Amino acid sequence: MPEEAETFAFQAEIAQLMSLIINTFYSNKEIFLRELISNASDALDKIRYESLTDPSKLDSGKELYIKLIPNKTAGTLTIIDTGIGMTKSDLVNNLGTIAKSGTKAFMEALQAGADISMIGQFGVGFYSAYLVADKVTVTSKNNDDEQYVWESSAGGSFTVRADNSEPLGRGTKIVLFIKEDQTDYLEESKIKEIVNKHSQFIGYPIKLLVEKEREKEVSDDEDDEKKEGDEKKEMDTDEPKIEDVGEDEDADKKDKDAKKKKTIKEKYTEDEELNKTKPIWTRNPDDISQEEYGEFYKSLTNDWEDHLAVKHFSVEGQLEFRALLFIPRRTPFDLFENQKKRNNIKLYVRRVFIMDNCEDLIPEYLNFIKGVVD
């Protein structure tokens, strides 16, 4: 018997923000996945940090990962993490009744023409789920509480109830019920493209449940049964039959040979890790070999040649950042095209991709330099 659900009203500013997200047309809706993966990564950071002083915190699940499960039949996209999880009060407060300080600021920025992709910087990235979903459920289990489910179709209210279904162990499972006109976000290729663009350097494995096909050899038993049935029918008829024993033996032999091998195609699912390239800019330059720099450069730029030079440094103080910059071996063919949009340096914040057209990062005369700033 399902537990009774409590209904809560969204805090006024949050309800306003959700209405704005749902009723305004935004072209880059794909950022919803970046935000949810980023939140999952934060939750994993928290449990890992707690486990440093108390290893027993990981008794509820040692493996730290993020998993994506598209289901075209049900029209859902599920995002699971084995992070710290949320208590009942976390679900009520964080997802609806207490407005983050950035809620109002973000709405004002949106109305002034800011890009929806800035949503995460204001601490309200979760609500970007409603760019592509008309209903969202969040199942969560924290070590200090029972398992609860938060649910909302964004109509000004949400429900929270105890959950006795499949136990998570620890962590959070978000199920997005995808809008009918957004089902391309259930395609494996689309999910891979978004993760590769925005979340390639998240510090935990991001696994995608993919459907694959393999060839399988089976014995042709069904054909046997069918043949036996046909023979029985023939025996039941009264007409006499002349048999050639030699021919029969040959036919039997051929039948057996054919029966031995029949190849069928079988579908199966398995987890595929999407973010195997690790963010080497977070490591100490002394520990990184030239081969590793070379591999990273090629994966970043799709250049087939090695780089000419590399500079890897960090700045600490009021403003903190790490930079890994490469000079390519060859001059770009469009070096002197002034109108071309520059996107050679990717800007990340805490390993999450933000933009690749930040013109203030480097002067125009150095626009051939490639790399990352985090």
From Swiss-Prot:
Annotated Gene3D superfamilies: 3.30.230.80, Histidine kinase-like ATPase, C-terminal domain (3.30.565.10)
Cysteine pairings via disulfide bonds: none
Subcellular location as annotated: Cytoplasm
Keywords carried by this UniProt record: ATP-binding, Chaperone, Cytoplasm, Nucleotide-binding, Stress response
Biased composition regions of type Basic and acidic residues, renumbered to the chain: 226-244
Region (Disordered): 213-262
Keyword ATP-binding: yes
A cellular-component GO term for this protein: protein folding chaperone complex
Binding-site positions, ATP: N39, D81, K100, F126
Biological processes per GO annotation: centrosome cycle; cold acclimation; membrane bending; multivesicular body fusion to apical plasma membrane; negative regulation of cell population proliferation; pole plasm mRNA localization; positive regulation of insulin receptor signaling pathway; positive regulation of neuroblast proliferation
SUPFAM superfamilies linked to this entry: ATPase domain of HSP90 chaperone/DNA topoisomerase II/histidine kinase, Ribosomal protein S5 domain 2-like
GO molecular function, one term: ATP binding
The protein's assembly and partners: Homodimer. Interacts with shu.
Assigned protein family: Belongs to the heat shock protein 90 family.
Known function: Molecular chaperone that promotes the maturation, structural maintenance and proper regulation of specific target proteins involved for instance in cell cycle control and signal transduction. Undergoes a functional cycle that is linked to its ATPase activity. This cycle probably induces conformational changes in the client proteins, thereby causing their activation. Interacts dynamically with various co-chaperones that modulate its substrate recognition, ATPase cycle and chaperone function. Required for piRNA biogenesis by facilitating loading of piRNAs into PIWI proteins.
Protein name per Swiss-Prot or TrEMBL: Heat shock protein 83
Organism: Drosophila virilis (Fruit fly)
